[in-house]
């Protein structure tokens, strides 16, 4: 018994000993697995906290105290930087290419440099303090030139109480060991061309780009037009070049320059007179060739300053986010082709904040994968200010397609989520992104391959940050798991083998970490409670140590912690075994449907999730491996000289070939481009070979120099509609045939393709405001649209079939995504309620909303020049909305209804209207007055308030038909029919004052036809010049029915009209049979044209007119007429060819083409000297009847299309004629040395008695008539106003109720009264007002002083002007003392004083001239003084400028029309 007990004792003892040893071992193991930490206190949060690349050295910059701290052991211990005085540092900048160097900048001229990663610091001196920009230093990327650095500083010259400052850039070649030398003054940014490892090019190693001003400034301000991009290869010693960007002298207004990935990008503001603030981007990939970035929807995607962001881009695509609506924080993401020039829409409604940051980030190291947030309720946000609802989208193919994030099926506790993951519209994962940053560095990913984390929520849209949870993806975003409840900061370490998170919603005293890719989590207590502010590690995520930045509440602070702490977390002891080869796996990126991108699959070597080991490859970035894929169609793009047309690439013209390949044999072939090329950088092999050369006939090759070529295409049916896209860079034309088929040519008629043969097309529309958009209307509710000039056509659904009531189907808006569709509703057979219904879309037809039913016409009130509510819609709407609309008569009147907020707030404006129209800045409504059975003309300048038009006696519209004519010179032109039916029609032209309310007689007996069209045409490019035909025999024509027409021209906007001066001899040198004062030139006008686009003049050739007519007493029949030309805006004419011809201008007038318009022909005539000599080109053996000659709308191309038909063949033919090889020399335009270029200066006033036109003498550039060169697409030189002229009689017209008598003087019409006098001028700050006379100044004239027949007796304006100038100067300066105190307070509070964390960005202090001096100060004056000070300032400026030497009067701006008192809204805001 005792032995048994002893045995049991021994067994128990051994078991006890074993358990004791086991517990000790477990304790030992557990002790080894625990991380360790150290805590270092600081006074303030850092402005910068960073590691030197691939080192353990770190920098902590406290900008509040102005101190720099250094750690040499990954943040375990910290010490103040040796060699830098306390409290001096305002900025720390590390060298991006040399990890030994960093620079501590002060606000003085003395700064500090380390070349040993912060161990020691030495001072250096520069001539000026640093500029207030985000990065005042630029570095060279070449290891041999890492000492080359550019430094931007600010130089100031004190003047009185203030200082005049400008920025200067200095350079050093030895990292400031040498004396910095001045590079360039008046700069806003300079950068080495070699400053990015991805921007690879062969340029000079010292090439530098600078955005600087080409003029110096006394007061520190500059005109934006003086900002240019300069370059140099010798630090501006002898080499100083202005980068012309391929646009010559127009490369001005440069806002910014940046190098992004492999692209250099320049942003400049379009300073052309017609521009409305658009920004232009120019891109280069080789520093030699710059190209303009082309966006698919021209107007909609206009870049505006502070309204676009170049986001993170790849080496094969540039990405830009553009704000399409004013004052919006919603954008559209565009991605480019491989050379960064042609962009396509990638993602709509992207979320961005007011600072321009966009919710878009690419996953690090994984090609093609990116995350973005979109605003799912964009319409409500922009329409009624609703709160944004954000959804997260992901792309795996570089932005080509986007999908929702599929959520996990379970939460972090294993419970099923509350929605169905299969329904991604209502149940998807959404993540907080760039606009709400919650850590340093990248938002989602790190260099750890394939790992991504985020804070977000599952559901229909993103929840607020403090209601979100933490998620992880280990396969680059394909799948996600919830790893922690609540929002956390997160970081990856040891190439992803360690994950660390810390609570980011509240204070905490611990962190969580995972060693198995987030499957399980361990807790580690820190020992103090803090609020996490940042969590970071080495930039390459290869370390096992982390830095946790925390803020400690006052109640939790101790003497060892302070209010800010840096906690180093060391996980190096948690695992003892280093991973070996068997612990790794091959991980392929993008395991979604699209594994290949840019021709290869991408894979990394990554630790297996369950491997219990550490990677330990510190400072070694993950190595990317590529497996090449077989080539597919996605690996190719259009070759040079080819453009996309649907699924094909078609040539823009004949292909250039090497000399000697084609020897003249018509059947000979050559190896030419297929139209495709492999995308540069693409590595695919085998598979589809779209870039192989193909056999082509030599007849298709580019002709030899001097030769003309043609190509004929047969259409089986008649052409009923054709039009080019308006974009001058695009050569695409659309054609619709009688059989309802659509055809397209992307190379100016050289080749043709049919668009969607399976559909019948009723019409097509080009977008009025977007040069790249067009819409094809079918006979169903399907329509097609393009946003890239026809390269792709997108199918869309309309809310209804197109209407059959004769109304325009589509109406457009300057915001190009806004559309109005008018279609049929309930119009099936035997329908009793068939009517027209209008709906609007704000997303280019994706979604539609009802406007109104039973309408005849609905349109946007907003127009390019009509300044109305952009969301207002105007409708002609029937009062009674029932029954069949086709049967409506006058008993159901048509009302005019306007509705703001997209017709939500409707308002009936008129009870009975005939219709409305928009012309220039005028909205015109024809109102029916049933009780008087008459018409009233109502005019509005804002779409809300209307004024009734006032007409001379006997010319009121109540008894006459009228036509509103083209109006572009701040006045309305109206043709009012004066003849009675059924006699031939003619009438009077009336012209309004500048607000469209008072109409005066301009010309009597002007011809019109039975359709209401008028022989009236304004000249393109020169305002105020117009041609008309008048009926010279109105009395006889009433009886005989035969009108005799004569032509008239005006050069002062209708004030006076003269006959056209005939040439002395005809085109054969013979004198005309008609002689004497009754003989004049008469030309056929608008009413006789088959194509109304065949205008007398061209937008590309200022001053040139062509017409068909005759010299005689009256106009002869068309077939008895000849062809005439004027080069001086109609002052003189010459006959250029016998017989009537169609004509077209090409290459800005260097080519003029004629085709016989009297009979079929087999040839054309062309001239290269504007009609002095003619040559013939035969293009067919069988004669054709030419119906029209067309070229691109800008008339800058050298290719033409003849549309017509053969005599014995049904259908139509299109003849493409190419003059590109006729002349090879490009015209030289030199505004600096005009005597030696190919252009001459010309003024419209050269051949007229008066020197000036509209009160100014203007000079234009035009090509010398007989020079042999091609103008091409080079930018035209701007016109130049030489001087503003003194007013003369031609600058005035008759006042309302006045007409000219036989002495050419204005007199009051008998039985009428003149307008009452008005002191309106006093509202504009004038000192005097004048009584009315019989004359008024033509609104478009800018003349000054001189004769003023419009001014009667002078009266002094009442009010403020009775005080002296010195009184108002004193009143103006009085508030400045208070302003200085307020300004000083805001200086201390705003961050401009040293000691704040935030530093201004590059755009923080613009150097461009704007509101400077006193005007800028007015913004700080207390509100109750602004009214008085503003009036005083206006008075002071007007008088000081009048006295200042060299002051210019310039153009007068009349914000209130001189006749404004007739408007019912004159005193309304």
Curated annotation (Swiss-Prot):
Entry keyword set: Glycoprotein, Golgi apparatus, Membrane, Protein transport, Receptor, Repeat, Signal, Transmembrane, Transmembrane helix, Transport
BNR repeat windows: 69-80, 112-122, 393-403, 471-481, 512-521, 784-793, 839-850, 1049-1058, 1166-1175
UniProt signal peptide: 1-31
Membrane topology: Multi-pass membrane protein
Transmembrane segments: 1365-1385, 1413-1433
Residue ranges annotated as Cytoplasmic topological domain: 1386-1412
InterPro entries named among the record's database cross-references: Sortilin_C, Sortilin_N, VPS10, VPS10-sortilin, WD40/YVTN_repeat-like_dom_sf
Compartments where located: Golgi apparatus, trans-Golgi network membrane; Prevacuolar compartment membrane
Glycosylation sites: 339, 995
UniProt family annotation: Belongs to the VPS10-related sortilin family.
Annotated protein name in UniProt: Vacuolar protein sorting/targeting protein 10
Primary gene name: VPS10
């Amino acid at each position: 018994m005792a032995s048994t007990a002893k045995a049991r004792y021994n067994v128990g003892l051994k078991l006890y000993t074993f358990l004791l040893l086991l517990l000790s071992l477990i304790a030992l193991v557990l002790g080894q697995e625990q991380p360790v930490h150290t805590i270092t206190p600081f006074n303030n949060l850092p402005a910068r906290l960073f590691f030197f690349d691939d080192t353990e050295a770190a920098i902590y910059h406290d900008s509040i105290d102005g101190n720099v701290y250094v750690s040499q052991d990954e943040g375990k211990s910290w010490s103040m930087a040796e060699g830098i005085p306390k409290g001096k540092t305002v900025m720390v900048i590390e060298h991006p290419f040399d990890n030994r160097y960093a620079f501590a900048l002060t606000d003085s001229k003395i700064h500090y440099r380390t070349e040993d990663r912060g161990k020691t610091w030495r001072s250096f001196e520069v001539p000026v303090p640093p500029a207030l920009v985000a990065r005042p230093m630029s570095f060279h990327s070449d290891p041999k030139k890492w000492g080359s650095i550019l430094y931007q500083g600010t130089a100031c010259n004190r003047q009185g109480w203030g200082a005049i400052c400008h920025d200067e850039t200095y350079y050093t070649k030895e990292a400031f060991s040498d004396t910095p030398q001045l590079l360039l003054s008046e700069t806003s940014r300079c950068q080495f061309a070699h400053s990015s490892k991805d921007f690879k090019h062969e340029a000079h190693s010292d090439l530098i780009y600078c955005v600087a001003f080409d003029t110096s400034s006394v007061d520190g301000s500059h005109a934006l037009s003086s900002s240019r991009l300069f370059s140099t290869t010798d630090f501006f010693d002898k080499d100083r070049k202005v980068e012309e960007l391929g646009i010559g002298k127009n490369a001005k207004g440069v806002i910014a320059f940046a190098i992004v990935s492999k692209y250099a990008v320049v942003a400049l503001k379009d300073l052309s007179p017609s521009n409305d603030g658009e920004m232009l981007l120019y891109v280069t990939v080789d520093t030699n060739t710059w190209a303009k970035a082309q966006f698919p929807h021209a107007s909609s995607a206009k870049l505006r300053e502070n309204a676009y962001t170049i986001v993170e881009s790849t080496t094969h695509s540039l990405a830009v986010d553009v704000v399409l609506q004013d004052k919006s924080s919603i954008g559209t993401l565009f991605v480019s082709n491989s050379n960064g020039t042609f962009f396509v829409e990638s993602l709509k409604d992207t979320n961005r904040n007011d600072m321009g940051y966009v919710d878009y980030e690419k996953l690090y190291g994984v090609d093609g994968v990116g995350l973005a947030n979109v605003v799912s309720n964009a319409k409500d946000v922009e329409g009624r200010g609703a709160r944004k609802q954000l959804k997260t989208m992901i792309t795996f193919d570089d932005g080509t397609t986007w999908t929702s994030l599929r959520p996990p099926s379970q939460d972090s506790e294993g419970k099923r989520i509350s929605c169905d993951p299969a329904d991604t519209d209502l149940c998807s994962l959404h993540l907080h992104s760039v606009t709400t940053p919650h850590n340093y560095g990248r938002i989602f990913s790190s260099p750890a391959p394939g790992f991504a984390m985020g804070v977000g929520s599952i559901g229909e849209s993103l929840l607020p940050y403090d209601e979100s949870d933490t998620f992880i993806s280990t396969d680059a975003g394909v799948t996600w798991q919830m790893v922690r409840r609540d929002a956390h900061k997160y970081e990856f370490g040891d190439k992803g083998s360690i994950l660390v998170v810390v609570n980011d919603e509240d204070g905490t005293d611990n962190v969580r970490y995972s060693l198995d890719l987030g499957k399980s989590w361990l807790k580690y207590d820190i020992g103090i409670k803090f609020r996490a502010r940042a969590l970071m590690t080495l930039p390459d995520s290869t370390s096992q140590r982390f830095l946790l930045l925390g803020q400690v509440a006052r109640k939790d602070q101790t003497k060892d912690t302070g209010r800010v702490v840096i906690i180093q977390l060391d996980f190096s002891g948690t695992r003892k075994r280093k991973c070996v080869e068997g612990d790794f796996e091959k991980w392929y990126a993008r395991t979604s449907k699209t594994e290949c991108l840019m021709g290869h699959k991408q894979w990394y070597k990554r630790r297996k999730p369950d491997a219990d080991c550490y990677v330990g490859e510190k400072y070694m970035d993950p190595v990317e491996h590529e497996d090449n894929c077989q080539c597919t169609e996605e690996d190719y793009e259009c070759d040079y000289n080819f453009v996309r047309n649907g699924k094909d690439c078609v040539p823009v013209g004949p292909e250039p070939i090497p000399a000697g390949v084609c020897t003249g044999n018509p059947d000979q072939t050559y190896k030419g481009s297929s139209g495709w090329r492999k995308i540069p950088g693409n590595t695919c092999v085998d598979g589809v070979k779209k870039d192989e050369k193909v056999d082509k006939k030599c007849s298709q090759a580019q002709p030899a120099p001097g030769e003309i070529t043609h190509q004929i295409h047969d259409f089986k049916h008649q052409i009923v509609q054709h039009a080019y896209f308006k974009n001058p860079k695009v050569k695409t034309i659309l054609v619709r045939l009688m059989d309802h088929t659509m055809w397209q040519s992307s190379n100016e008629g050289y080749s043709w393709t049919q668009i969607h043969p399976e559909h019948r097309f009723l019409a097509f529309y080009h977008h009025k405001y977007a040069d790249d958009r067009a819409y094809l209307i079918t006979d169903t509710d399907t329509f097609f649209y393009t946003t890239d000039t026809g390269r792709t056509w997108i199918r869309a659904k309309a809310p209804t079939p197109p209407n059959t009531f004769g109304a325009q189907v589509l109406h457009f808006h300057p915001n190009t995504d806004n559309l109005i569709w008018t279609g049929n509703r309930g119009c099936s057979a035997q329908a009793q309620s068939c009517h027209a219904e209008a709906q609007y879309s704000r997303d280019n037809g994706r979604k539609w909303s009802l406007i109104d039913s039973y309408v005849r016409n609905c349109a946007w009130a907003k127009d390019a020049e009509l300044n109305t509510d952009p969301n207002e819609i105007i409708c002609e709407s029937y009062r009674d909305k029932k029954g069949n609309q086709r049967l409506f008569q006058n008993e159901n009147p048509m009302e005019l209804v306007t509705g703001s907020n997209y017709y939500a707030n409707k308002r009936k404006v008129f009870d009975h209207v005939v219709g409305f129209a928009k012309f220039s800045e005028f909205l015109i409504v024809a109102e029916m007055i049933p009780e008087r059975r008459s018409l009233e003309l109502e005019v509005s300048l804002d779409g809300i308030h209307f004024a009734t038009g006032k007409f001379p006696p006997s010319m009121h519209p109540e008894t006459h038909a009228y036509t509103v004519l083209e109006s572009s010179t701040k006045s309305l032109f109206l043709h009012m029919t004066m003849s009675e039916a059924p006699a031939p029609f003619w009438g009077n032209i009336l012209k309004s004052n500048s607000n469209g309310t008072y109409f005066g007689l301009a010309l009597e007996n002007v011809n019109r036809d039975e359709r209401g069209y008028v022989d009236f045409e304004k000249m393109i490019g020169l305002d105020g010049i117009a041609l008309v035909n008048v009926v010279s025999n109105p009395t006889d024509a009433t009886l005989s029915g035969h009108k005799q027409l004569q032509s008239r021209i005006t050069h002062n906007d209708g004030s006076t009209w003269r006959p056209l001066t005939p040439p002395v001899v005809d085109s054969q040198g013979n004198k005309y049979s008609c002689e004497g004062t009754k003989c004049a030139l008469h030309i056929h006008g608008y009413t006789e044209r088959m194509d109304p686009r065949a205008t007398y003049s061209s937008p590309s050739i200022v001053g040139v007119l062509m017409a068909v007519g005759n010299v005689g007493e009256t106009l002869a029949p068309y077939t008895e007429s000849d062809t005439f030309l004027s080069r001086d805006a109609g002052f003189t004419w010459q006959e250029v060819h016998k017989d009537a011809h169609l004509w077209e201008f090409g290459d800005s007038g260097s080519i003029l083409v004629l085709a016989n318009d009297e009979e079929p022909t087999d040839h054309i005539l062309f001239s290269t000297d504007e009609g002095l000599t003619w040559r013939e080109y035969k293009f067919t053996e069988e004669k054709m009847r030419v119906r029209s000659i067309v070229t691109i709308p800008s008339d800058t191309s050298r290719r033409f299309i003849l549309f017509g038909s053969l005599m014995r063949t049904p259908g139509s033919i299109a003849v493409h004629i190419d003059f590109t090889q006729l002349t090879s020399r490009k015209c030289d335009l030199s505004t600096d040395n005009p005597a030696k270029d190919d252009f001459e200066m010309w003024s419209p006033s050269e051949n007229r008695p008066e020197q000036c036109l509209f009160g100014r003498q203007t000079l234009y550039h035009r090509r010398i008539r007989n020079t042999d060169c091609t103008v091409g697409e080079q930018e035209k030189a701007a016109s130049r106003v030489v001087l503003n002229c003194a007013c003369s009689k031609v600058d005035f017209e008759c006042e309302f109720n006045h007409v000219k008598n036989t002495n050419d003087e204005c007199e009051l019409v008998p039985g009428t009264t003149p307008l009452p006098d008005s002191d309106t001028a006093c509202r504009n700050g004038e000192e005097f007002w004048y009584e009315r006379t019989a004359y008024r100044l033509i609104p478009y004239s800018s003349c000054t002083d001189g004769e003023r027949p419009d001014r009667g007796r002078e009266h002094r304006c009442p009010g403020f002007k009775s005080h002296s100038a010195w009184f108002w100067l004193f009143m103006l300066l009085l508030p400045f003392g208070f302003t200085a105190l307020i300004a000083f307070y805001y200086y201390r509070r705003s961050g401009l004083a040293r000691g704040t964390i935030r530093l201004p960005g590059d755009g923080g202090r613009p150097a461009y001239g704007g509101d400077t001096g006193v005007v800028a100060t007015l913004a700080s004056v207390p509100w109750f003084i602004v009214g008085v000070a503003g009036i005083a300032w206006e008075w002071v400026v007007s008088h000081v400028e009048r006295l200042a030497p060299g002051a210019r009067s310039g153009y007068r701006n009349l914000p209130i029309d001189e006749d404004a008192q007739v408007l019912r809204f004159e005193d309304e805001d």
